[in-house]
Amino acid sequence: MSDLKKYEGVIPAFYACYDEQGEVSPERTRALVQYFIDKGVQGLYVNGSSGECIYQSVEDRKLILEEVMAVAKGKLTIIAHVACNNTKDSMELARHAESLGVDAIATIPPIYFRLPEYSVAKYWNDISSAAPNTDYVIYNIPQLAGVALTPSLYTEMLKNPRVIGVKNSSMPVQDIQTFVSLGGEDHIVFNGPDEQFLGGRLMGAKAGIGGTYGAMPELFLKLNQLIADKDLETARELQYAINAIIGKLTATHGNMYGVIKEVLKINEGLTIGSVRSPLTPVTEEDRPVVEAAAALIRETKERFL
């Protein structure tokens, strides 16, 4: 059984880093990894939704993971999302991830066609078989994937010894309780919705993987510590403050990840490009909201850190 301790804590979802032509930038990718190392996070979740994976080629995703591992190996826990909407490419990415020495691979279910549970289980197990020495995390995000991880499907997947748990991004925190109960002490649940990090942790999640963590890692690290210290009143205040920031990050015409990249430029001096079409980049009309979001992060740090 894998040592699950290495997965506990704050694990930001890694952002795609592009050059001015919209191509993957190795240099900017490495700079973002170093930023996260310097902030003190537990690990990174690479090539997931926040990494714009569904708008990238297999080769793009390989390059990103190679650049991440060149900087992060031995310093951060790395979970590589490898799912594509076909089994062959997913298995290729799984083999590649294992060859680089990632800690775990993860997958969403196949999307568009509504497949029966036995087909989803086969898809996941086939991908896992391509990385036989690597831990496996199931990603439950039914509101986007259109497929929910049911108790019966999770029970079936627990027969796979490489399955270590679930990244749960469904909104009901009761789902976390369900997966914790089914998996027991030998498995881990990651909280997915950033707005309920506190609630998810209290329901049994041992860690969080989130798309807004990267804009404010210090705040999520502080929230994680407050939970460990059982200072739940302050933790609730901080969660409310974080949620206000998330409200700003999602209040623009441009896509949230484009906003976060602009916030990182303002607050951290990091330039990692924009977002890839069909995601909408930040517009000039968005600029006041972007500036307000960046300022709110700075103010919240001053208040809680």
Where are these regions (language model features)?
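Charge-dense, low-complexity intrinsically disordered segments
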Residues: 1, 23, 55, 59, ...
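Short, low-complexity, intrinsically disordered N-terminal peptides in bacterial proteins
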Residues: 1-4, 305
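Structural motif
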Residues: 2, 36, 97, 155-158, ...
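Active-site beta->alpha loop and helix N-cap motifs at the rims of alpha/beta catalytic domains
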Residues: 3-12, 17-148, 264
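C-terminal alpha-helical cap/extension of soluble enzyme domains
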Residues: 9-17, 39, 205, 212-305
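General structural feature for long, well-ordered alpha-helical segments within catalytic domains
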Residues: 25-28, 32, 60, 64, ...
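Secondary-structure boundary/capping signal
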Residues: 76-77, 135-136, 165, 187, ...
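Catalytic alpha/beta core domains of metabolic enzymes, predominantly
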Residues: 130, 142-243, 249, 253
